[in-house]
Each structure stands twice: as C-alpha cells, then as structure tokens.
Swiss-Prot record:
Family affiliation: Belongs to the phenylalanyl-tRNA synthetase beta subunit family. Type 1 subfamily.
Primary site of residence: cytoplasm
Top-level taxon: Bacteria
One Gene Ontology term from the biological process aspect of the record: phenylalanyl-tRNA aminoacylation
Gene Ontology MF: a single term: tRNA binding
Cross-referenced HAMAP family: Phe_tRNA_synth_beta1 (MF_00283)
Subunit structure comment from the entry: Tetramer of two alpha and two beta subunits.
Subcellular location: Cytoplasm
Any GO CC annotation of this UniProt entry: phenylalanine-tRNA ligase complex
GN (gene name): pheT
Stretches assigned to the tRNA-binding domain: 38-148
Record-given protein name: Phenylalanine--tRNA ligase beta subunit
Cysteine disulfide links: none
Length: 802
C-alpha cells in the first residue's frame, strides 16, 4: 500500500519524523520505502478565468483573459475542445514556467493580441497522461499561488507500507493513524459524520440469502447524478500518489474512500425501479458477463448481488455488462457489505469470483462500526461533486448470524508469565483503552472486548502482544526461556531413522526438507475427503494449510526437478504430519512419517544399461530393504487396497503384523495431469512410530549344519496374492524351514486364463542336526498339500503329484 505523507498527517495530531516510521515498523506495519514526490514542472501558478474572447477554429484554440493577481491580467490560450466558465480557477504556465519534459512557453500573437500564457492540462504537468483534461483548482485557493505549494510537491513524500495478512487495520490511512496514535498516547482519530439531505424517496429491499457469510448489508440509491464532472485535483493527486489511475469521478471517489477508510463500496448503474437487492450465491449453470461483455467463470460458491432478474455485480465488485457504470449513467446504487472472514478465507467454502484487491480487504475483515459513516462519506462526495438526489439508507442484518464482539479473559498470571511482572495493572488498563479495547477489571483477570477493526485478536496471548507493543519491546528485560514441554527421549527411534536415511542415500535417493505448510489446492487433489487445517495468518496462499502427508513436498520436488530436465528422480523426507483427532489437544494429532518418491528412469543413461522407466516393484523392493534392515521383513505384508490418489491396480497398504503402517502406489493419471507430472511417479509413506518402537534384537546360534534348497512351481488363480502363499509356506515346520523366496512369476497360454505360475525356493536347515533327504521331502510334500487345499494350487512338476 502506498499513500501520501500529507494524507496521513491529516489524521494525526503530531508531526512525523524518521523515528515515527521506525516505530511503525516495530508495531507490525512495515515501512518498505519512503520516496520524495517527483515534480515535473516549475513556476506554474493559479489563474482565474475572467472572460472568453474568441476562437481560432483553424488552429482549434481559444483565447482567454486570465487574472493572475489583483494587478495583473494576461491573455492565455487553450484547446477549443474544453469548456470554460467565468470564475473557474485553472493552472497557468507563463514564460517563466517549465513544463513536463522541460517544455517552455513562447508568446503567440493573434489579431493584435499577445498570449503570455497557456492553460495547463494534466499531461502538460506530467501528472496524468490525459491531454484534454485541464487542471481545475478549487475556488478557495488564491490566484497567483504556486501549484506545487497547493499540491504539496515541495514538502510531501510517498510512503510504501505492508502489513501482516491478519492485520486488516494496516490497509487504510485511518487504521494506520489509529495504531500510531495509540502507540504515542494520543486520542484515536474518529471519522466525521456527514449529514445527507434525503431528496429521493425510492423504496427497495435488501435480502440476504446467505446469512452465515454476509452478516449485514447497507445501501442507498442516488438519482440524477452527473458523472461527466471532473474529479477534484486534490483527490486525483492523492490517488496518483497511491499508484491508482483515474477512471471516472465515481470510481475515483470510491477508491479514495477505500484507501482512507479501508471500506469497500459497491457501485453499479440501475435501470428503472429496483425492488430487491439480493445477496446470494450463483445458481447452477448461471452465467456472468463483465462490463467488457467477457464471460467470467462462476460456480455455486461465488457470492454475488442481483435483483429479481439478473446478476448485478460479483462479490469482488466486478460489475455485469448491464450494470456497468459509464459517463451517461444517471441513477446509481451504493452499498457496503460485512462478510464473515471465517467463511471466505477458505476457498473451499465461498469465493467472490477471481481474486483482486477488494477480496483482500474482505478476507482480512472490514470494520463494521464505520459502515454507515463510510457510505455517508461517499454519498457526501458524490453529491458535492456530481450532484444528485440521495435516498435513505436501507439496512439488512443476517437472520442467523450477528456481529458479536468477542469477549476475552486476560489472566494476570498469564500476563506476568510472559512479561515478568513489569507492566502494572494500571498501565494494562491504560494501554488497552488507548488501543480501543473495552476493559472490565476483575479480581484475577481483565475482561476485554477488542475494537471492531481488530479481527486478528482471538485469544489472550493476542491481547498481551498488543500490550507489549505499546509498552515497548525494548522495555522488556531479557530472560531465559522457560518451557513446559516434556521431552520423551527415545533414541532408538531416531537412531533407526538415521540408519534408514543412510540406506536410502546409498540407494540413490536425495533427502529433501520442505515446509509443514503446503498449498491447499494440491493437498485437496491428493486427499479430497480428508479435513484440512487452514492457517489464519499464512505466509502466502501456497502455504495456507498444514500438511496431511509428506507427498505434497515430495511431488513438488519432482515437479521442480522435472522442469529442469532431470530424468532420474529419487527423493525421501521425514517429518511431522497433522490429522484430525478429537482425543488429542486442539483436535489435531501429529505423527512422524517417512516418505519417498521415484519418477522418471531407473538409472542415468549409460552404455551398460538401458533407459528403463521406474516401476511399482522398484519402490516395493526398496521398502523391503528398509524392513530387512529393521529386522521386520518377515512380519511385513503388502495388501491390495484402493486409494483415491493412487492407481487402483498399482497400490497397496503396508501392514506390520496386523496393523497398517503405510501406503505404496503409483500416482493416478488424473493427479499427474493436474500437477503436470510427465513421468510415472511412485510414492510410499510409512508411519515411522509404528515400526521403529518395536525393534527386537534376538541372539541366536549360527547353525553348524549344512542347508539344502528345493524349488517348486505352482499354478494358482491370478487373484491370489503371492504374499499369502509365502506366509502359509513359512508357517509349515518353522523349526526346519529357514527361508521361503518367490523368484519367478509367469503368465502365459499354457498356464491358463486368469492364472499365474509362481516359482518358490525353499531353504531347509536345522540348528540341531543335518536334515536327511527323507525329512526334506516330507516337509516339502506337506507344504504342497496345504497349498493345494488352501489355494487349489496345481504343481507344475508331476513328480510331486499325489
């Protein structure tokens, strides 16, 4: 936000120095830059039109007699396209003047008259790039006054500030003036009340169909306005110094009030008699065309204003084609809304259409106490400049939701714990009253109600931080930090995790560290049915939600590297994730996760290997290596399970014994397309706590006797998981079978439709004796019999048929 220093001074009762701006930055409204006003002209003065003499149609100029002082009168020229009336005060450039681009004025002789000056347009002075708009001066300014003094070119500066997303008061001159007045122990500035003469008795109703979102709405109509009037120079210049260009007089007035008060005002053209103004959301298949007749996409969550027939304006103040304002508009509607920031900050609930500056004001919160005054202020300026007949203000309150000022208890012990007993009870009450709070002192606490412009004050810690701002951070003595955290030391968890990280690095993975706050839209793609936790004060929109999974950061890393022509991508990350749990503190549970992703090719291009795309089994093998290192592979299984964000036939749940500990699968094509992933991408995620806490270290003797292996091939239905067959095989004669491995899977015509051939290797051994061929054969036959009974397995080797 940018504004004129003089504009801010109008609201303050004291002078400004650089110390003031340091104080502003410390208070939470950061001063980014202070710049002097660039003046593109010199010695241009105020003159008064006395008489219009004659017109030179050939050169399209008009001669004027202009009064520069009580004793001096000159002839001046101007474009014939501009109308002049007697007594109009204008900017005059004489022979001593220097205009924009160092242009000088020369005398012009015509019909024995010599022109000694020129009427200046905004373009001549380098203020606005509008050639046929002359600079009109208000009648109170004496003739002969230097224009630069009238416009404060010599002693004004442009201030650029930014405030935190939760500070709605930092987006207006009034809000900044309030904050700085409180910090300097001065009375808070108040908005002047303007009395409006009611000369228009048109009646209409305002209906709120979304009471949870729109808390109230006020509006009025003004008839017979003249929008061809020129915006006063003092408004134009203040807008220019706020980097806002002029459109028309009504838009200029509304922008002026927006910057000064932080109050957005709806304005649109009305045709005939309006009976109802309805605040609602868009209907199914409803279309909206803006003032340029361009179609704007809207949906059932889009907030808008309509009459009984059509949409008039979107919630972001985008007028429809039929309600657009033009210089020929005579009847207008002005309105002011109070929206609930809790609903509109979350895009999944409601929106105003496309985002713009207006939506930022609404998302931060609008001061409900000055709505009526702000509407009257705009009305006053419109009537003064453009004329017209104003109606009464019509008010509509939400039927189910009212504006309730939040009551907060600030405990003395909490305050003293943070600031170490250095702010007395008397100062607490004094500072809170300075800041605009309502305060009631009680025995062990203060009951406070925040001011209407501070939507960010929610808990007692917010109030305490406000107190410290006024008291001064430099006055708080430094002391050692005291925490109430109970740290649970479980070195085994982190030792195991560090060991696994080394393994993954050896396998070609790179560790990434990403923020715990992620893009809510990407997270919605991945987990459409899971509840998200949104931040009230996000750093940016791409960091607005707490992560439910590590996949958000990993997929973003893949996308980043993919866009830089990387083709071998293997990443892993460990960190906390957050999910809803009513039994936990604040209803949020956090767990440590380990996750990984592979995408692109298996290896770099090399003469020894082919460019092979990664597959599901590549990542499954890496997970099995992790489990083997943790000595848990024999208790881990992969079971088919459907996940919305993964491909149905290439995803599985990972189980440790009977408990689900993770997920593995290929990212679905739908999500890959939305995110722009070029290659097949496979991910996994493990709840680390569930597998790291139960490490069993058992000592056993190494067998002195030789081992023997046997291979078999069986045919089973394709729907039977190989893991189930391995489990059953391992449970047969556990004291003799050392290991069972699957070393081949085969599909073919000879096997049969919906059938598959599995080749198993049995490794027999005993720690007590050497197993004879008879014992090994009996064990293997028993295992085959059980497989036949349980899975209808067919042995491919006929020597083992019964």
């Amino acid at each position: 936000m940018e504004f004129s220093e003089k504009w801010l001074l109008d609201w303050l009762g004291f002078s400004i120095s650089n110390v003031f701006y340091e104080q502003m930055t410390k208070s939470g409204i950061e001063v980014e830059a202070i710049a002097k006003i660039s003046k593109n002209f010199e010695r241009v003065i105020v003159g008064e039109v006395v008489e219009r003499l004659y017109v030179n149609t050939m050169h399209n100029i008009v001669f004027l007699r202009v009064k520069l002082s009580e004793k001096k009168m000159i002839f001046s020229i101007s474009s014939n396209d501009i109308e002049f009336s007697r007594g109009t005060k204008i900017a005059i450039a004489t022979q001593d003047s220097k205009l924009f681009n160092n242009r000088l004025i020369s005398m012009l002789r015509f019909k024995e008259k010599i022109s000694e000056g020129m009427v200046c347009s905004f373009k001549d002075l380098g203020i606005l790039n509008i050639k046929n708009k002359i600079v009109e001066i208000c009648s109170e300014v004496p003739v002969g006054t230097d224009i630069s003094k009238f416009l404060w070119f010599d002693d004004d500066r442009i201030i650029k500030v930014s405030s935190a997303p939760n500070r709605a008061d930092g987006m207006s001159i009034l809000g900044i003036a309030r904050d700085m007045s409180a910090l300097n122990n001065l009375c808070l500035p108040t908005l002047k009340e303007y009395h409006i003469n009611i000369t228009n008795h048109e009646k209409f109703r305002i209906l709120i169909n979304i009471p949870d979102v729109c808390l109230n709405f006020i509006g009025r109509t003004i008839q017979s306005v003249n929008l061809n009037r020129q915006t006063p120079l003092w408004i134009l210049e203040r807008l220019r110094r706020s980097s806002i260009s002029s459109e028309n007089v009504l838009v200029d007035i509304i922008n002026y009030v927006l910057i000064e008060l932080g109050q957005p005002i709806f304005s649109f053209n009305i045709h005939g008699i309006v009976q109802n103004i309805i605040i609602r959301t868009a209907r199914d298949n409803e279309q909206f065309f803006d003032s340029c007749s361009q179609r704007v996409p809207i949906d059932k969550r889009t907030i808008l204003l309509s009459d009984d027939k059509e949409i008039l304006v979107l919630g972001n103040h985008t007028n429809s084609y039929n309600s657009r304002l033009s210089l020929s508009s005579h009847n207008i509607f002005l309105g002011c809304a109070l929206f609930n920031p809790e609903y509109i900050n979350n895009d999944s609930h409601f929106n105003f259409g496309f985002k713009n500056k207006i939506t930022e004001y609404y998302s931060r919160g609008v001061d409900s106490d000055i709505q009526y005054k702000a509407l009257n202020y705009v009305t006053y300026l419109v009537l003064k400049i453009c004329g017209g007949n104003a109606s009464n203000v019509v008010l509509a309150n939400s039927s189910r939701v009212t504006v309730i000022q939040k009551k907060i208890f600030v405990l003395k012990k909490t305050l003293h714990r943070y600031v170490n007993n250095i702010i007395s009870d008397t100062l607490v009450v004094k500072y809170l009253l300075q800041l605009g709070y309502l305060v009631e002192k009680q025995k062990h606490c203060w009951l406070v109600i925040p001011p209407s412009w501070r939507f960010d004050i929610q808990i007692q810690e917010d109030v305490i931080s406000d107190l410290v701002r006024v008291f001064g951070y430099h006055n708080i003595p430094a002391c050692a930090l005291v925490t109430n955290y109970k740290l649970v030391h479980d070195d085994n968890i982190y030792t195991s995790l560090n060991r696994i990280k080394l393994l993954l690095v050896d396998l070609g993975y790179n560790e990434v560290i990403t923020y715990s706050f992620v893009d809510s839209q990407i997270q919605k793609y991945l987990f459409p049915k899971r509840k998200q936790f949104f931040l009230l004060n996000p750093i940016s929109r791409k960091m607005s939600s707490m992560r439910l999974s590590l996949w958000n950061g990993l997929l973003s890393s893949v996308l980043y590297n993919q866009n830089r022509q990387e083709k071998v991508m293997r990443f892993f990350e460990s960190g906390l994730c957050f999910e809803e749990d009513g039994n936990e503190y604040l209803g949020v549970k956090q767990d440590l996760y380990l996750a990984g992703v592979i995408s692109g090719y298996k290896n770099e291009t090399d003469w020894r290997s082919f460019n092979k795309i990664v597959s599901f089994y590549d990542l499954k093998g890496d997970i099995e290596l992790i489990m083997a290192l943790l000595r848990k592979l024999d208790k881990v299984s992969f079971k088919k399970m459907l996940f919305q964000n993964l491909c149905p036939k290439q995803s599985a749940a990972i189980y440790f014994e009977r408990e689900m500990i993770g997920v593995i699968g290929v990212i679905s094509s739908n999500i890959s397309k939305k995110m722009g992933l070029k290659y097949k991408t496979i991910v996994f995620e493990l709840i680390w706590k569930k597998i790291a806490q139960s490490n069993d270290y058992r000592i056993r003797d190494v067998s002195l006797y030789p081992r023997c292996s046997r291979d078999i091939s069986i045919i089973v239905n394709d729907s039977i998981a190989a893991d189930e067959i391995l489990k059953v095989s391992k449970n047969v004669f556990l004291d003799k079978i050392v290991e069972v491995k699957l070393f081949d899977v085969f599909y073919g015509k000879n096997v049969g439709l919906n059938k598959k051939s599995l080749s198993l290797r049995f490794i027999f051994g005993s720690s007590k004796r050497t197993l004879s061929e008879e014992i090994i054969s009996n064990c293997l036959n028993e295992c085959i019999r059980i497989l036949q009974e349980k899975f209808n397995a067919i042995l491919r080797d006929r020597n083992f048929l019964f």
